[in-house]
Amino acid sequence: MNKKRIRQMDLALRRRLSDRPAADYFAPGDALLRTLETEGYMQRFAGLFSGARLRCADVLSLCRPELEVLCPGEPSEGWLAYAYDYARRLLYPEKTGAEPFAPGAVFLLSVLQVLFAAEAELLPHDPAWTFDFLTDDELAGSPSAPSYQRFLRLWRREFVYELMRLGLEVTPYRTLEHIAGVHHIAVTAARALRKSGVAVDVALVSGAAAGHDLGKFGCRPGERVPYLHYFYTDQWFRRRRMTDIGHVAANHSVWDLEPDYLSVEALLLIYADFRVKQLH
């Protein structure tokens, strides 16, 4: 990994820590931020790029010195599980008491975000792990462009991808592989249809596919996830004023095929979701 990339990653981390939600814990001039500016901090992680996908546990082991400075002790469930739950609560806030470990969780999530962005550039696209979001040229002329751009900003701000990567290591579920696979199939088909002349809003398909199962992170213990995650998915999009994408995202069950008319975007998502479930 060359020095230019390390400098870019250092800059990306500082910018991430100066934006919400990290900015709630790291004020300008913070001692840790000053250290990051002079140390070349991301060089520490260069050895993790060995041609394989990064493991959150390996990143955590290299972040521990900073976490010890930021927080008194360690969460009882461990840093990875705590960071996972913290990110989940960014999507679906809950009433909690004081969170003394929140600065550490935000720092770890921010480091993961920078590292995963570098990983996406260095490794080949994997439909089960990564998302091929739309380019600016593809987005031009889309009626859903404003909502889609907002979706991508919130995807980063709320650490959605990092949440799913952590989930592979701290839960028994493979939610990332399912959501990424659905996105790949739906967007690939939408791009092909658009190229052939069919009127399809690829941005609407991409946003709905990437967000179609976010509601699973809103379900609470004891709730019936297969039924209620549609409601929580719709809730996430509505609260963030992206109802155009949310309407398609929340109605992806095969039972939604019953109405006489569905948009091509909705049909693509339902098909992709069904196909990925068959594959697994």
Question: Model-derived features: where do they sit?
Answer:
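Inter-helical turn/loop segments and adjacent helix faces that build the functional surface
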Residues: 193-197
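Short Lys/Arg-rich cationic patches that frequently serve as NLS/NoLS or arginine-rich RNA/DNA-binding motifs
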Residues: 1-5
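Active-site flanking loop/helix segments enriched in acidic
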Residues: 152-179, 213-221
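Internal, Lys/Arg-enriched amphipathic helical interaction segments that engage polyanionic partners
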Residues: 87-146
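A positional/architectural concept
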Residues: 181-184
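Conserved N-terminal diphosphate/IPP-binding helix and adjacent helical/loop segment
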Residues: 22, 26, 32, 148-158, ...
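Divalent metal-dependent catalytic cores for phosphoryl transfer on phosphate-bearing substrates
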Residues: 18, 24-35, 42-93, 110, ...
